[in-house]
Amino acid sequence: MMNKDMLLHQHQQPQQDENMSNLTSASGDQASVSSGNITEASGSNYFPHHQQQQEQQQQQLVVPDSQTQKKRRNQPGNPDPESEVIALSPKTLMATNRFVCEICNKGFQRDQNLQLHRRGHNLPWKLKQRSNKEVIRKKVYVCPEASCVHHDPSRALGDLTGIKKHFCRKHGEKKWKCDKCSKKYAVQSDCKAHSKTCGTKEYRCDCGTLFSRRDSFITHRAFCEALAEETAREVVIPQNQNNNQPNPLLIHQSASHPHHHHQTQPTINVSSSSSSSHNHNIINSLHFDTNNGNTNNSNNSNNHLHTFPMKKEQQSNDHIMNYHHSIIPPWLAPQPHALTSSNPNPSNGGGGGGSLFSLASPAMSATALLQKAAQMGSTKTPPLPPTTAYERSTHNNNLTTTMAAMMTSPSGFISSNNNNHVLFQDYNASGFDNHGREEAFDDTFGGFLRTNEVTAAAGSEKSTKSGGGEGLTRDFLGLRPLMSHNEILSFAGLGSCINSSASDQLHPKPWQG
């Protein structure tokens, strides 16, 4: 019996163990399932909550934008057009006792305040009551001062207290004064606030003036800038007027040769030399006027004429030129514009442009000068019909002006092959007859030769006193004295013209009368 019980107990024990294991596994599975369900549930619950938080944050960000879109308060001085405009006198506006209590004689600015005060005295009082149907109109107040911007109803202020403060501060008596800048204020609080910042910051104008007040600085700067602009405009306008003055010589040439009017007029830009300041002053002191033949001082000739380089021997004769420049007749005075009145194409006549002197021609030696002069030669043109006396005299002045400019600066006597015939081309193309040509040559070269004789005599004395070395020039053939203008002209083939014109004066030809 006992053995059976033991066997049954042993047999039941594994079953119990198996059942326990099953229970444990089942519980474990349930636990795992439950834990998984909890995790899934928690996960499913977490994400929607997070999304809700994000949506709430986005809504909070949108709310300020909607709040800023609310209607703002009107700016001061921009009232509602439908508002009621009230104009008070200065006395009424500044009165402190408009409404007085008959018991204690206390004054009030508003009737509402007086009615509330009457309640304390057990007096009958009445407050204004508005019905719901009554249309409320806004009230605006204009400034009593006629010169004030707020006197206009369109710039009225919407508050009675505000208009009172405005009138008191801007137009009332200013009793309070700043000790630093002497600025006055009508309200003591404003003066105290100003004194805290007065002098702590400086405003400097471009002209060097210092200001402690910004408003004074702004006013001064506006005036200073306007004054500077006006001064600059006055300086620029006269220069433009001088630069735009037409050359009378060029005007006559363009009128005489209208078919060459389309040709451009190149300008001269020659670098000035310090040694040529004397000749520059001599040329500037003489101004040739082709209209009336008078000599006028040209104050603005520096804007049109540039000096040319001089050689050493020319510098030594500066005092001679200074002494004898008064000998030159007024009609031989060079026109500054004459330096640009030559013609680059001699075959077309004398109406074109061109430069008498090259852009950058250095000081030429005697040999180079003679070679250039030899290239000129003498030009032969067919006889042209005679012209009037006016054209003859005008072109005579033109030729005289050109020769004066050439003789003034011998270093730039001839600049290029394009200008070889510039001396006589305008003269030959102008339609002179033989008699007019001889008169022009005689008047022009006769005056220059007479002046040159005086200059040469003074130059010989100077060279003798200085040892004889200052009057020499270096060329390819060595040292030799400077050639006179007579030698240069005779070498260039012009001497015969001068001699013939001089002899014709003494012995006039039969056809000349």
From Swiss-Prot:
Q: What does this protein do?
A: Probable transcription factor.
Q: Where is the composition biased (Low complexity)?
A: 51-60, 264-280
**SHR-binding, as annotated region:** 213-225
What are the binding positions for Zn(2+) 1 in this chain?
A: 178, 181, 194, 198
Q: Which Pfam families match?
A: C2CH-3rd_BIRD-IDD, C2CH-4th_BIRD-IDD, C2H2-2nd_BIRD-IDD, zf-met
Q: Which UniProt keywords apply?
A: DNA-binding, Metal-binding, Nucleus, Phosphoprotein, Repeat, Transcription, Transcription regulation, Zinc, Zinc-finger
Where exactly are the zinc fingers annotated as CCHC-type? 203-226
C2H2-type zinc finger locations on the chain = 99-121, 141-171, 176-199
Matching entries from Gene3D superfamilies are given as: Classic Zinc Finger
Q: Give the protein name, as stated in the record.
A: Protein indeterminate-domain 11
Q: Disordered: where is this region?
A: 1-84, 255-280, 334-358
Q: Which residues carry this modification: Phosphoserine?
A: 89
Major localization listed first in the record, in broad terms: nucleus
Q: Which residues bind Zn(2+) 2?
A: 205, 207, 220, 224
The GO molecular function terms of this record are: DNA binding; DNA-binding transcription factor activity; zinc ion binding
**Is Transcription included in the keywords of this UniProt record?**
yes
Organism of origin is Arabidopsis thaliana (Mouse-ear cress)
Q: Does the keyword Cytoplasm apply?
A: no
Mind telling me which GO cellular component terms the entry cites?
nucleus
Enumerate the InterPro entries for this protein: C2CH-3rd_BIRD-IDD, C2CH-4th_BIRD-IDD, C2H2-2nd_BIRD-IDD, IDD1-16, Znf_C2H2_sf, Znf_C2H2_type
Residue ranges annotated as motif Nuclear localization signal? 163-170
Q: What biological processes does GO assign it? A: regulation of DNA-templated transcription
Q: Where is the composition biased (Polar residues)?
A: 10-45
